[in-house]
Amino acid sequence: MADLWDDIYNDTKLLEELAPIAIDAALLQGVLMRTKESPNSSDVVSFAPFALLPSPVPKALFEQAKCVQEDFNTLVDRISQDTSFLEQVLSSTIKVDDFIRRLFAIHKQVQQEDCTQEVFLGINRSDYMFDCRDDGTPALKQIEINTIAASFGGLASRTPAVHQHVLKFLRKSEESSSILTNDAVEGIGWGIAHAWALYGSVDATVMFLVENEQRNILDQRFIEAELCKRNVRVIRRRLADVFERGTLDEERHLFIDGYEVAVAYFRTGYVPQDYTEQDWEARLMLERSRAVKCPDVPTQLVGTKKVQQELSRPQILEKFLPDKPEAVARIRETFTGLYSLDIGEEGDEAVRVALANPDQFVLKPQREGGGNNLYGEELKEKLQECKDSEERTSYILMDKINPKPLKNCLLRAGGRVQISECISELGMFGVYVRHRDQMIYYDQVGHLLRTKAIEHSDGGVAAGVAVLDNPYLV
């Protein structure tokens, strides 16, 4: 596995020749991002960073991640319907984390107002690394599950063609034909279209809720194109636009700029800096509305690290999946050690062990978007700072996953062509649609492989650390 492409990596002249061919293939396939200098204009775009060659991934672990995704779909949906569980689990976090507190307050307010919802749409992505066990064999271990704005389904659907072209250029036709197709964008588009259809108005629109700066717009445009094929109109608006021009009628139908909104698909709203006070008002309006929210607030809260940690406790999975013992076993097999930092003996012991062995753990806040986790000395400093205060309850502790590094060449605009020691993270996309109490559809719909140099502890493609990749199953 380690020497899959060594004949290429050892040929510096070939690498220099190959890199521009791969970059042009990415341009031809639309694997693109806007530039940092002009994040809201497509006049000038660049290729999204990607790996020169596909990274080897154990076939058994890929299939394991694929198989368990439907289980995670069911689990996320069921937890999102249990407000008392979310309130109990997040009670300590809400005291010290204003972002989580405000989200939960919106959920409680909408519940008290009895703003019933009939159609539910979930688009999530469960991320894993391949932990190297003591005997040298790899094991699939979950990093997190993203329940809001799970990105790169669009671009990931186009990267297989890039690596197929590169391998054909290298006269490796058999290897080229082994690159997996990736139907993430079709599955995501199908899920949104199905929710739109269940809303029941052919004149209604799908609204993408987007950030003020939209570098990754091309990833979203692929999903828009899928919806266009199905004759579903898409509009793009910011939360600020919803506040300024959004209205609810007496039956809670949401309108903006003359459009009735059937589905509100979030590609923003996952970190505190996404919100002004007016944006929070817009989020409340959206949550009150009859529009299908992807996600609604409780589903977003299911994706918090605190809920992830709580699910690792005995009997919690069984509480939500009492009819699915095999699913419980599949999910539990992906868990690594997760530890509460709540005030009390259990949290005190976790702090003590982490301070004594900081390189064995990751300190994780309740934040999405990459680049937020703390490792090593930074972990130690933060825990020393907050070990005796309630601030520590805004974090969880997780065993550090240790993948075996592999070689690759990471291509970035303006970057050098050089070989790096890398690790990869595998994401599986899941989509589900529920109508009242009936699950209409739930499936694993595609994958995402991101690879980064080992010197980077945290951060994804959008954060400028990882690059897009494809799994080459071995």
Curated annotation (Swiss-Prot):
Residues at which Mg(2+) binds: E144, N146, E368
Pathway: Sulfur metabolism; glutathione biosynthesis; glutathione from L-cysteine and L-glutamate: step 2/2
Alphabetized Gene3D superfamilies for the sequence: 3.30.1490.50, 3.30.1490.80, ATP-grasp fold, B domain, Glutathione synthase, substrate-binding domain superfamily, eukaryotic, Glutathione Synthetase, Chain A, domain 3
Reactions accelerated catalytically: gamma-L-glutamyl-L-cysteine + glycine + ATP = glutathione + ADP + phosphate + H(+); gamma-L-glutamyl-(2S)-2-aminobutanoate + glycine + ATP = ophthalmate + ADP + phosphate + H(+)
EC class (word): ligase
Tissue expression from the record: Expressed ubiquitously.
Keyword line: ATP-binding, Glutathione biosynthesis, Ligase, Magnesium, Metal-binding, Nucleotide-binding
Entry's cofactor comment: Binds 1 Mg(2+) ion per subunit.
GO cellular component: cytosol
Cofactor or coenzyme needed: Mg(2+)
Binding site for substrate: 125, 148-151, 214-216, 220, 267-270, 450, 461-462
Binding residues annotated for ATP, in chain numbering: 144, 305, 364-373, 375, 398-401, 425, 452, 458
Enzyme Commission no: 6.3.2.3
Recorded GO MF terms: ATP binding; glutathione binding; glutathione synthase activity; magnesium ion binding; protein homodimerization activity
Annotated family: Belongs to the eukaryotic GSH synthase family.
Entries under NCBIfam families matching the protein: glut_syn_euk (TIGR01986)
Task performed by this protein: Catalyzes the production of glutathione from gamma-glutamylcysteine and glycine in an ATP-dependent manner. Glutathione (gamma-glutamylcysteinylglycine, GSH) is the most abundant intracellular thiol in living aerobic cells and is required for numerous processes including the protection of cells against oxidative damage, amino acid transport, the detoxification of foreign compounds, the maintenance of protein sulfhydryl groups in a reduced state and acts as a cofactor for a number of enzymes. Participates in ophthalmate biosynthesis in hepatocytes.
Subunit-level organization: Homodimer.
Name of the featured protein: Glutathione synthetase
Organism (species): Xenopus laevis
Taxonomic placement: Eukaryota, Metazoa, Chordata, Craniata, Vertebrata
